């Protein structure tokens, strides 16, 4: 058994909560939790605790929810905890240098990609969007930059041809906690070996937007198919048909050519809706029309065949 560390945990969503749960099952002591302030959620816009706060309260762990760390009070609260280390996972607040320097061993972060490949807010989505063969989690010593700290541990896994951001999120949420526990064991034993990042290899994983998710049929079919998976579950790749916004849940690339303009429907039957792109043909397999759940193309065509007639130009 490695030395027990006094840990302050900072995180907010479910991804972070799974890492907190792993820490609570380890030999380490979680002495406090930092998470974002309760936010309105649901139809009633009722103030709702984050998944991390929920777990912390279940285990009687003190919870701190500052809007930021600008006040002397917030800084002093953290200092008074006398933590060995702060573990940060999808916290959502920028940490100033004074916070990074407060725990004896500084702050470490679990990042959802193989650094330095994707720094920034949407590394899971961008790895699929770009067609990367693998992804993973990187645990790094935090510095004042955006995901620029020295790397302490990397765990990898392949990106399968069927992976969406939703499925990859689940995989990384399972991979990260084990990597974190291993990394903390190395830190506690004084065996951690920081590796500097090569800035030349870094890309910025910018946030996704609904505008970006609108399909441009002039793109390559392979790129559109990756976007469909990368933008699932949000913001969802979409296009217009019969003046309705249609979300694409599943598609595949068909290696065929056509002299028809991009966006033209070549074929529409139970095997899919075949659409000309800038390079290749994209076959739409599962769609969602306004007010309905996602359905197979066969079911869509049973009720809305007129929207997808051969020769129709999608926009």
UniProtKB/Swiss-Prot annotation:
Chain sites annotated for binding (6S)-5,6,7,8-tetrahydrofolate: 113-116
GO molecular function terms attached to this record: methionyl-tRNA formyltransferase activity
Catalytic activity annotation: L-methionyl-tRNA(fMet) + (6R)-10-formyltetrahydrofolate = N-formyl-L-methionyl-tRNA(fMet) + (6S)-5,6,7,8-tetrahydrofolate + H(+)
Enzyme Commission number(s): 2.1.2.9
InterPro entries xref list: Fmt, Formyl_trans_C, Formyl_trans_C_sf, Formyl_transf_N, Formyl_transf_N_sf, Formyl_transferase-like_C_sf, GART_AS, Met-tRNA-FMT_C
Pfam family for this entry, one: Formyl_trans_C
The UniProt record lists the keyword Coiled coil: no
Role, per record: Attaches a formyl group to the free amino group of methionyl-tRNA(fMet). The formyl group appears to play a dual role in the initiator identity of N-formylmethionyl-tRNA by promoting its recognition by IF2 and preventing the misappropriation of this tRNA by the elongation apparatus.
PANTHER family: METHIONYL-TRNA FORMYLTRANSFERASE, METHIONYL-TRNA FORMYLTRANSFERASE, MITOCHONDRIAL
Protein name: Methionyl-tRNA formyltransferase
Organism: Vibrio campbellii (strain ATCC BAA-1116)
Gene field: fmt
């Amino acid at each position: 058994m490695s030395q027990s560390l006094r840990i302050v945990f900072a995180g907010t969503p479910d991804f972070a909560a799974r890492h907190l749960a792993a820490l609570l099952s380890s030999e380490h002591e979680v002495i406090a939790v930092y998470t974002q302030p309760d936010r309105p959620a649901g139809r009633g816009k009722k103030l709702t605790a984050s998944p991390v706060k929920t777990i912390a309260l279940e285990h009687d762990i003190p919870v701190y929810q500052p809007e930021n760390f600008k006040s002397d009070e917030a800084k002093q609260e953290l200092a008074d905890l006398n933590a060995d280390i702060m573990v940060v996972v999808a916290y959502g607040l920028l940490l100033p240098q004074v916070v990074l320097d407060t725990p004896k061993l500084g702050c470490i972060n679990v990042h959802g990609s193989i650094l330095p490949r994707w720094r920034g807010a949407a590394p899971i989505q961008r790895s699929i969007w770009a067609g990367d063969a693998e992804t993973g989690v990187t645990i790094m010593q935090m510095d004042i930059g955006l995901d620029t700290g020295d790397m302490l541990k990397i765990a990898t896994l392949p990106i399968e041809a069927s992976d969406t951001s939703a499925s990859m999120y689940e995989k990384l949420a399972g991979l990260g906690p084990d990597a974190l526990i291993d990394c903390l064991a190395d830190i506690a034993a004084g065996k951690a070996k920081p590796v500097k990042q090569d800035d030349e290899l870094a890309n910025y994983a910018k946030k996704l937007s609904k505008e970006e998710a609108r399909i441009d049929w002039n793109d390559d079919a392979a790129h559109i198919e990756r976007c469909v998976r990368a933008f699932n579950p949000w913001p969802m790749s979409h296009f217009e048909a019969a003046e309705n916004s249609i979300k694409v849940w599943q598609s595949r690339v068909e290696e065929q050519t056509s002299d028809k303009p991009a966006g033209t429907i070549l074929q529409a039957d139970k095997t899919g809706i075949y659409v000309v792109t800038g390079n290749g043909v994209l076959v739409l397999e599962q769609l969602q029309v306004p007010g309905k759940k996602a359905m197979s193309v066969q079911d869509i065509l049973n009720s809305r065949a007129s929207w997808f007639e051969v020769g129709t130009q999608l926009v």
